Amino acid sequence: MDQPVLYNQPAFPNFSYSPGLGQEGGNYQYLGNYNAPSYPQPFFHVPPAIKSEYGAQDEVTGGSCHAAPFDWHLYPHFQFSNQVGALSSGDPSPEGRNEEDHGSISEERSSGTPSPNSPMVPSYAQYWHHAPWQGNPTGQALGLPSRAHPDGGEKPQQSDCSPTASLESGASNTEDEEVSSALSSRAERGLCSPSPNNASFGSGNEEDGTTLEEMEEFAKELKQKRVALGYTQGDIGHALGILYGKMFSQTTICRFESLQLTFKNMCKLKPLLEQWLGEAENNDNLQEMIHKAQLEEQNRKRKMRTCFDSVLKGRLEGHFMCNQKPGARELAEIAKELGLEKDVVRVWFCNRRQKEKSKSRMSKAHEFVGGASPVPSPAEHISQDYGLAPLHPNRPPFYPPPFPRNDLFPHMVPGMSMGVLTG
């Protein structure tokens, strides 16, 4: 026996329903084509107003449904191919849909514009209801922006999966065109960004008639002649101090040779280096002078530390007790009285005041530790039971009261003690 088509099943043999009742197709638990004992079919009442749209009253039966039949599935799913057209036209045959697909594709290829039922325009159909979005309701082709083709014609731009995506792609293409046009204009002008190392220099930077190329040549020549004469970068700095009274460090000379100084500073340093270069080539004793200056700097003795005997120290302590911060005139009188230099007396008073501040800080810290602290430390409570020495010996120990056994459960029945329970 052939299985009947959906919505054309005969009624149960022992059950018949009136024409005013129709099958509810939205119930997913009803499996009409299942070859097993059928489940009870739910029904809902069809009012006459709705029933008159589909036919007369006597025509409303279990198989009188004008909706397009679909392949049955237990749960709804998406069908991306021409669901809008199928729902709107109501063609029940899949062959007709295939013919429409081929016809729409051929028309799209001939006209060059996508149709509203194209697979590129998605539609999300819902079973037993009309589609929420049926594409272009007017049936006209969507006006998509066209892009100039290299052959001379216009090539239509294909739409993306959604209108929002198409707008975003158009915006990104516009930005790319702007960036490419800016780059092409910069390339036409011949502009180029300078390197990070030479960011402070430029091809047109000139100061005192010196260009960057001339500065590079001079730095290269300076390094070659310095190595040939046997001088170090530190020797050049000392020589500039001996000859011109302005000493430079080895780091400054190194940065000049490697062009890491600013162009303005290099222009200021170049005349001194040119004079030193001429002096080094003509004066043979220059290197000896440099070594002598370096030895004098190394052998320069530090000032001897002043030592005070007990008598002198006692007299200074007496003046300090009278006035801890004397003025310039008082310091001069004390230095004259003790036969010392004024700076020595001044430094001694400064050191003595600092020593007094340190003593006051230590005494305050000791009083805070030895006195009553606002918050008791946990070591005091531990020492009560475990025999540890208390942190503050001057404070009397604290002994907690015994455990209140009888007052533990005051809500219990009177006469019931916390001792041994008697049965």
UniProtKB/Swiss-Prot annotation:
Start and end residues of each stretch annotated as Disordered: 85-211
InterPro entries: HD, Homeobox_CS, Homeodomain-like_sf, Lambda_DNA-bd_dom_sf, POU, POU_dom, POU_domain_TF
Annotation: DNA-binding region: 301-360
Record GO cellular component, one term: nucleus
Matches recorded under SMART domains: HOX, POU
One record GO biological process: cell differentiation
Domain POU-specific intervals: 207-281
Function, as annotated: Transcription factor that binds to the octamer motif (5'-ATTTGCAT-3'). Antagonizes the activity of nodal/activin signaling during gastrulation to suppress mesendoderm formation. Acts maternally to inhibit vegt and beta-catenin-activated gene transcription, probably by forming a transcriptional repression complex on the promoters of target genes. Binds to an octamer motif in interspersed RNA.
Annotated family: Belongs to the POU transcription factor family. Class-5 subfamily.
Protein known as: POU domain, class 5, transcription factor 1.3
